[in-house]
Amino acid sequence: MLITGLIIGCLLIGLVIGYVVRQHQHRQELLAVQKQARDIIASATAETQQKIAKLTADSRRETLTYQQSVKDELAEQTSDIAVREQRRQQREQLLGQMGVRLADQTAILDERSQANRDQRQKIRDLKAQALQLRTDRDEMLAQQAGIDEQAAKDHVLADTELDLKRDRDVEIKALNDNAVANAERWAKDVVLSATESGPQDLPKEHLEHTVTVPNGEIRSKIIGRDGQHIRLLETLTGTDLIFVPDDNTTLFISTHDPIRREVARVALTNLVASRRISSNQIETQVENAQRDVNHSLWETGEQTVSGLHVGWMHPDLMKLIGRLKYRTSYGQNVLLHSIEVAQLTGAMAARLGYNTRLARRAGLLHDLGKAIDHEVEGTHVEIGTEFAQKYGEDDVVINAIAAHHGDVEKTSPLAELVAAADAISGARPGARSESVEDYINRLRALEKIANDQSGVAESYAIQAGRELRIIVKPQELDDTAAANLTQEVAQQIESTLTYPGKIKVTTIRKSTAVEYVGDEKKKKSKKKKKKAANA
């Protein structure tokens, strides 16, 4: 019991002591906090006073600066106002001077206006007097001539019209005579100038009809077992593939379609290069070749159109132009021929003052029908005209295509230029070529037409078939008949033969008389002298 009391007493004492200690600590902490608060307040007060002092100084400085700027601005405005006032005074002075001048000019104008009114009145009076004099003259002339005024006017007008018509006819005749006299010279100058500066020399491309096979192994692969591969190639390309009999390394591609020939050539070249030849490879290479050739057709057409600067053209027409690259006529590449015709036509049009772009366009498209004349029925002129109309070409271009061989009438000067450029391009030396057999047959056909005519002694085709000379029998044909013979032969050549350029037909009629004088008489004279001497 005592122990319990001691424990409780100890606890109470401990609580009292803890309370006292806690109160003391709390008082110490409170004092520390109060001291810290006083320090913070003092520091804040000092900082605030510093800021107030700084702000006051800044404000005073800004105020002074603002006052100075206001003073400067006021001074500037005062100066500006003074300058404006000076200008105003000068303007007022100038306006005063202008007012004086205006008053002077107004007075002068009033005087001139009055003078003009007086002059106009005088002119009206003079016109009235002239009209009265004219009326009196007409009445006097009518009385003297015995005709009225209207009849006299009609007579004068008729005489004047007759004189003007006569002068006009004389002037027109002089112009026509001058044009006729100089037309050939002018035309030669235009053509010569165009041929010198117009067409560019383009390399003559050779179209390959063969593919070289490097060895017998590749040859066997191309033929295939029982000819399977070569028959597949012929079926897919639409061509006939023939190995040259005496040269097993040369494969000849036979077809009338130049595009198919090119597809077959490209496919075979790729197969030979890859050395992998099977049915699948053949089909793949033929498809690739068709795609590449079709793309090259469009690309060639686009480059040609762009290079000649003929403007926008339908893609189908550009593809047809590309097809001309693989078409030849008398050995001349039709695309190069068309480019040359376009350049010549444009050059001549420039010298004559016509539309050069339209001229080059007509020249480029004039042989368009040759691109597909082996696929579509009709002449290349008809086909080209139809496609030009289909794709909305200009009427001048359509007429130039239709008329460049004389099938229809030429309705524009550009059509004449296209026909002339076509003839120049085809007739120039080296432009066209033909096989030896065709060349000899053409010469023989020319000579046969001449030799079949009555009165012809002999004939010769010279200048590579560009001239035919006919020698006639003078005792059978006179000069008139010889001229008629020349015309008849020219007409037969034009109607029966196909020839590049133009052919000159010359008929020669020559009569020679020979008589010998002197030898027989001298012999007889010598015999008489000998007889006299012997006697």
UniProtKB/Swiss-Prot annotation:
Xref: Pfam families: HD, KH_1, RNase_Y_N
Lineage, highest ranks first: Bacteria, Bacillati, Bacillota, Bacilli, Lactobacillales
Keywords linked to the UniProt accession: Cell membrane, Endonuclease, Hydrolase, Membrane, Nuclease, RNA-binding, Transmembrane, Transmembrane helix
Keyword Repeat: no
Protein name, entry field: Ribonuclease Y 2
Enzyme kind, highest EC tier: hydrolase
Regions crossing the membrane: 1-21
Family matches, as InterPro entries: Diverse_Catalytic_Enzymes (IPR051094), HD/PDEase_dom (IPR003607), HD_domain (IPR006674), HDIG_dom (IPR006675), KH_dom (IPR004087), KH_dom_type_1 (IPR004088), KH_dom_type_1_sf (IPR036612), Ribonuclease_Y (IPR017705)
Main location: membrane
Subcellular location: Cell membrane
Organism: Levilactobacillus brevis (strain ATCC 367 / BCRC 12310 / CIP 105137 / JCM 1170 / LMG 11437 / NCIMB 947 / NCTC 947) (Lactobacillus brevis)
Known role: Endoribonuclease that initiates mRNA decay.
GO molecular function, one term: RNA endonuclease activity
GO cellular component: plasma membrane
